[in-house]
Structure formats: structure tokens, C-alpha cells
Amino acid sequence: MKDTFQRSINYMRISITDLCNLRCQYCMPEKGIYKKTHQDILTLEEIEQIVRIGAENGINKVRITGGEPLVRKGVIGLIKNISNIPGIQDIALTTNGLLIKKYGEALKDAGLKRINISIDSLRPDRYKEITRGGDLSQVLEGIQEALRLGMTPVKLNVVVIGGYNEDEIEDFANLTVDDPIDVRFIELMPIGEASGWAKDRFLSNEEVKSKIEGLVPIITDATSPARLYRLPGAKGRVGFINPISSHFCESCNRIRVTSDGKLKPCLHSNHEIDLLRVARENPEQIGAVLSNGIQLKPEKHYLYTNKHEMSARSMSEIGG
């Protein structure tokens, strides 16, 4: 499917829960979020149906997100079913890593191809602070489990926060040397909990990159948001995702579906289409709604302009 700007849209990011077993400061309020009823979120069958119809209309890549997707009961079966949908070539998962050791084998057997792990510090005390209680050792065990299972390259998503973890940039980059790990530095975005302090703590990826010596640029997939580099002799890669300082809207190939069934043509727009209602009342219209949503994708986001409306949703509600 192509949008009005002739971008090919083949990638669906679908959040299966807004619940999480962490409370990261820039993602979720300390007390958590209002717990929706089962009636208010997509069932696993509805998620599968949406992906199936998406595949019939050109979607071939799917990423399962949250919240923390591994806290949703039935996630293994969902991944297995999606991986068997004709046309789906790639299925990936974004997780905080705490439950990979527990579910890794089952995830691989279900057909999961790739895994992204969100981790913003390699220091136990600091990690516990930013996540409001997380155990770093569990995440590190999860990374090793993903490597053992061959889900490579294992991608680590690192949000760089000025005055907080910028002194760990080189430590993260060095993780790519001995293992097939891709470390991707992501600029802090003004969404939800982060909107109040994103400007004060924002660090551009040009600044981040300047702190890593010896990076060599490598060829990057044009549709990937990450600009990739490699340290000399490294098995993995270092990537930079710059949604603020150098957006990649011109090559955007994705749509998002939230756990409560809202189709979001753009992460940074408040415009949403109620796909949950369509799935329950007129499921035969799902394909048309997906197509319409794609046509409504804006040319670019308008962060930090007078056209931008700050999202009231947390990142866990939208889907990370």
C-alpha cells in the first residue's frame, strides 16, 4: 500500500497491552495507568484478524509492542499464529527484557525472528532509579538468552537523557564489539511523561555520536530509522535514531495500532481511527479502514512547531 506521498507502507507496529512490569520515568506515571477492562482492548483474535487483513493489503512486517508485551497472557500463541499468516515475512518483539529468560525458547519456537530490548543504563542503581524498581541483572540475562537462541542481531534501544546516562554512551557502544548486538541510541521524544522535561534533557544524536571514537558508517536500509555505524572489528553495530534532530518521515513505512484498537497513521500526531469498533461491528471494513489510515499519514511530524498538539497519551498507551 502507498500513501499520498508515495511511501510504501508495509510495516505494522501493534501494541497488545498498555500494562508493564516497570514504571520508567519518561514512559509511565509512577502509580501506573488506568487499567482498561478486557472489553476496552483488542482481543488476541482481533489482533490476529487485523494483521491478517493487513497482510492481504501489503503488510509484511509486524512488530509486537506494549507496554510490556510479555505480560499479556497468550502472547506466545499470538506470535505463532501471526508468523503463520501468508505474506508475513518478519515478526519482531520490543520488550524490556525482564521475561526473556522465562519465555525465550517458547518465543523462538513460535516463530519470533528478532527482538529489541529497551535498556537505558548498565548500572544497577541507575537502572533501578529510571525504571522505578527494575532489576538490571534480569535484563542482562535476557540479552544473553536472546544471543544463545540466535535471535541476532539482538537490538538494544537506548534513550539518551542529558544529565542522566550520557556518561554511559561509550559503555553501550562497546557492547557491540564481542557479540552480534546492535545498540541503537534514540533521541528523547516529548511524549506523555517525557513531554515536561524533554527539552531540558534532550541530547541530539550528533552529540552522542561525537562521544564514540572510531565509528565507520555502513550501508543502511533506506526504510530503517537507524543510521548505522560499526566500531573496527566489531560483531555488532551502533545505530542512531533521530526523530527530533533529523527526522526520517520521508521514508516512513509504518502504521501503529494501539492496544485499545486505535489506528495511528503517525506516532507524533493525535489523529487516531477507532479500529476496535470497526473490528467488532463491521469487520469486513477493516481493510478499508487500514487503507484510509494510510492515506491520512502526514508528510512529516510537526514536533516543536506551532502545528503540533502534544499527545496526552503515555508511550506505554501508544505502544513503544
UniProtKB/Swiss-Prot annotation:
S-adenosyl-L-methionine binds at residues 26, 67, 118, 189. Keywords: 4Fe-4S, GTP-binding, Iron, Iron-sulfur, Lyase, Metal-binding, Molybdenum cofactor biosynthesis, Nucleotide-binding, S-adenosyl-L-methionine. Residues 4-226 form the Radical SAM core domain. PROSITE patterns: MOAA_NIFB_PQQE, RADICAL_SAM. It catalyses: GTP + AH2 + S-adenosyl-L-methionine = (8S)-3',8-cyclo-7,8-dihydroguanosine 5'-triphosphate + 5'-deoxyadenosine + L-methionine + A + H(+). Its EC number is 4.1.99.22. The keyword Metal-binding applies. Pathway: Cofactor biosynthesis; molybdopterin biosynthesis. It comes from the Bacteria. [4Fe-4S] cluster 1 binds at residues 20, 24, 27. Monomer and homodimer. HAMAP family: MoaA_B. Belongs to the radical SAM superfamily. MoaA family. This is GTP 3',8-cyclase. It comes from Alkaliphilus metalliredigens (strain QYMF). The gene is moaA.
